[in-house]
């Protein structure tokens, strides 16, 4: 906090902008998901699960800088250093949860005092439930977000987005006279390769100033 205050004071003396940015909000993948949710194209969102475990780190990584993985100097582990962007996206996409239950491992995989493994369950007033899993101790790991809604399932893995779209699971449950049938689905793939190749997240943030 002391160093942060120094940076703020310096920026003010030069009348310059000084900010901490969460650039993933401008990632075209999540911008599209935000549009689908806000436009009610997914219907009611029932559940999401984000498994972000491709942050694999070694003991040597934590030993290279004295500030790493210490409560006093970093303030936490995988949640504050690596997965802070995904936590921010959870809040941006789905809102603030009403309650959070978390089971975390302090130095489960590494010789550190802070968390390197986390499993959290988010509960929301509207009935939505979310699961968030992250660690720096699994290899090869995965980055996968599932969003289950009344209009089907969206899967985002390594920036590949697939929507298995249906009319309405709620209406099908109410009105179907079959035992095991499921609603017909349409598979939609979204392609963001060109935008992602240009690394436009930081560009958009800078343009926003």
Residue ranges and their predicted role:
Residues 4, 30, 86-87, 202-207:
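A general structural signal for well-ordered alpha-helical segments in protein cores
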């Amino acid at each position: 906090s002391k160093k942060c205050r120094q940076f703020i004071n310096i920026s003010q003396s030069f009348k310059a902008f000084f900010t901490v940015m969460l650039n993933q909000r401008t990632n075209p993948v999540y911008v599209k998901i935000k549009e689908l949710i806000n436009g009610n194209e997914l219907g009611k969102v029932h559940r999401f699960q984000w498994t972000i475990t491709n942050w694999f780190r070694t003991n040597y990584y934590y030993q290279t800088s004295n500030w790493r993985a210490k409560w006093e100097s970093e303030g936490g582990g995988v949640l504050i250093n690596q997965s802070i962007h995904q936590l921010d996206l959870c809040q941006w996409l789905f809102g603030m949860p009403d309650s959070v239950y978390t089971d975390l491992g302090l130095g489960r995989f590494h010789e550190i005092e802070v968390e390197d493994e986390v499993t959290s369950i988010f509960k929301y007033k509207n009935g939505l439930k979310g699961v968030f899993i992250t660690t720096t101790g699994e290899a090869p790991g995965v980055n996968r977000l599932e969003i289950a809604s009344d209009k089907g399932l969206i899967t985002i893995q390594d920036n590949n987005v697939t929507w298995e779209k249906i009319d309405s699971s709620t209406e099908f449950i109410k009105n179907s006279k079959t035992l095991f049938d499921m609603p017909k689905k349409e598979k939609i793939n979204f392609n963001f390769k060109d935008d992602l190749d240009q690394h436009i997240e930081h560009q958009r943030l800078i343009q926003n100033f």
